[in-house]
Design a protein with these regions (language model features):
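A residue-level signal for conserved active-site and pocket-lining positions in enzyme catalytic cores
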Residues: 12, 120, 272, 452, ...
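A short acidic, amphipathic alpha-helical/loop segment
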Residues: 130-135, 331, 346-349, 447, ...
Length: 540
């Protein structure tokens, strides 16, 4: 390995990577992935599933309509299908049935799968105590696999969930990550029992787990870093044909190598769009496609749903921005004519525009999605506002909830009060200036870009390095993309793009000074020639 540049050494140090850990961090390998048996109850879950295979009982994988749920469902369906099992997939409908094992979704699952003997949940089920009991009363066995926080009572069945058993090494797995470990345990046991003698299934399943890990915004450290890095390395050779077809429709020109952005910004949002706008079943057909024709048709549909999602999102964002309350400690924006499936994205987009960033809730028809900046736990804020809510759930940075009838205004007031107290706990020193290093144009070389790539995969827990350049010269400012949603320009002569900020083109053109401080990330590009491009984060 060539000598690490001083700037890269500083980046590694800022991420807490010691000298002894640099090689492992820069070269994540499946050899360092912990064995599935270290995840409590994975053995019991695999035995229950193989018992159903041997008895030729019908198995239903009960998933979710988002990317994590779709990928987790596909992982277990692909695995069990390879064994010749009688297996079907079931995904609830977001708008009519809601998340997880609701009464309506369980009823439809039973109607569509008469004679089902075993239900295996993925990415849901940990809080479905009553519906698990209902299924058992009907003579249906249940295995719950999930990664969400449990309530006070666990379902009365085999449960595989790192949030329950607390194995530190697996604590940040997503639903598909849990399913991937279970699938590996299934294959090992099936081979030992003579139920499977075919080729390795690891490649396609790994790609699905890596995609879900990035899209579900899991920390990309430890086991997750290995999963995602190896999934990206194997994408071209092992990705399911549907994902490769979708990537060909979504990818930009000049891509040098696969990065976490391919998962987080190209594939993941498109798969999520199907569940948001129409049905997660459309995305599931994509990732389970076996032929090129089937894959291409499914990719066309999913890509079209993403276009629909963008149009709906843009209209909702414009309406939401018009309802912002200046200086409020939190924003609760009621959009009665919006689309519930896009509320979370719009909340995130609004939060990105806030300075300083504050928690944002977008409510559509009484159902809301919340997003919060670092340092504020939005789930805790919702809990403290619970008297105005029917239910809520989620994570520190993102959550969902339902508001009691006629209580949006009261909830807005209480939520803002709670967040004002939480915001005060985030001190200015913790926020910093958002820059990893201030650089000059001479620092921005291909060599630096190549070294930055070695820090991939970027995401939660391992953010992409943000550089700053003072007194940069801005030229050739112009809109980019469909309807001018993005902004293209040169910064000191270097090609640059500011995604999603086509709205400031005219403002920058009218600016009395074309010399500004610019924050950005760096990328390699082979479009036209091998060169460095900048991705703008902020112009000050």
């Amino acid at each position: 390995m060539s000598e690490i540049p001083q700037l890269v050494e500083r980046l590694l140090e800022s991420r807490g990577i010691s000298a002894d850990g640099i090689d492992e961090f820069l070269s994540p390998s499946l050899r360092d992935l912990a064995p599935p048996c270290e995840l409590p109850n994975v053995d019991a879950a695999a035995e229950a599933m193989l018992a159903a295979v041997r008895a030729r009982r019908k198995i239903v994988i009960f998933g979710d309509y988002d990317c994590d749920g779709v990928c987790a469902t596909a992982i277990l369906v692909r695995t069990l299908s390879a064994f010749g099992a009688d297996v079907s997939a079931f995904l609830p409908e977001r708008l009519s049935e809601g998340y997880g094992m609701s009464e309506a979704s369980v009823a439809r699952m039973l109607k569509e799968n008469p004679g089902v003997g075993l239900v295996v949940t993925v990415d849901n089920g940990i809080n479905s105590v009553e519906n698990v009991a209902f299924l058992k009363e009907k003579g249906v066995d249940v295995v719950v696999t999930d990664h969400h926080l449990p309530g006070d009572t666990l379902p009365d069945c085999v449960v595989v969930n790192p949030k329950v058993s607390h194995p530190e090494i697996f604590e940040n797995l997503c639903g598909a990550g849990v399913a991937f470990l279970l699938a590996n345990e299934l294959v090992t046991k099936a081979r030992g029992a003579g139920l499977y003698s075919g080729p390795s299934l690891a490649g396609p399943l790994l790609v699905l787990a890596g995609l879900a890990t990035v899209t579900d915004v899991m920390p990309l450290l430890g086991q997750n870093r290995i999963l995602v890095a190896e999934a990206l390395n194997r994408f071209d050779s092992f990705a399911p044909v549907g994902l490769r077809s979708l990537f060909s429709k979504a990818a930009r020109r000049g891509v040098v190598r696969h990065t976490s952005k391919d998962f987080g910004f190209l594939l993941g949002p498109r798969i999520n769009a199907a569940g948001r706008i129409a049905s997660g079943a459309e995305a599931l057909r994509l990732v389970l496609a076996n032929s090129q024709d089937e894959a291409d048709e499914a990719a066309r549909i999913v890509n079209g749903r993403n276009d629909e999602r963008k149009n709906v999102e843009q209209k909702m964002l414009e309406n939401a921005l018009a309802k912002i309350v200046p200086s409020a400690a939190a924003q609760v924006i009621d959009l009665p004519d919006g689309h519930q499936g896009v509320a979370g994205i719009v909340a995130a987009r609004v939060m990105e525009r806030m300075d300083p960033k504050v928690p944002v809730c977008v409510v559509v028809g009484g159902h809301g999605s919340a997003r919060a900046p670092d340092g504020i736990n939005v789930r805790d804020a919702l809990a403290a506002s619970g008297e105005f809510l029917n239910r809520f759930g989620g994570h520190a940075a993102a959550a969902g909830f339902s508001v009691k009838d006629g209580m949006v205004d009261a909830f807005r007031e209480r939520f803002a009060e709670v967040c004002a107290g939480l915001s005060a706990e985030v001190c200015d020193e913790e926020r910093g200036d958002g820059v990893d290093a201030w650089v000059s144009p001479d620092d921005l070389t291909i060599e630096l870009a190549e070294w930055i790539t070695r820090l991939e995969p970027f995401g939660e827990g391992n953010p992409e390095p943000v550089f700053g350049m003072k007194n940069a010269v801005l030229r050739d400012i112009r809109p980019l993309g469909a309807e001018g949603r993005h902004l293209a320009l040169t910064v000191n002569g270097m090609r640059s793009v500011w995604w999603g900020r086509g709205d400031v083109v005219e403002e920058l053109r009218r600016s009395s000074s074309a010399v500004r401080d610019v924050l950005f990330t760096v990328e390699e590009s082979d479009y036209g020639s091998h060169h460095v491009e900048l991705r703008i984060v902020e112009i000050r």
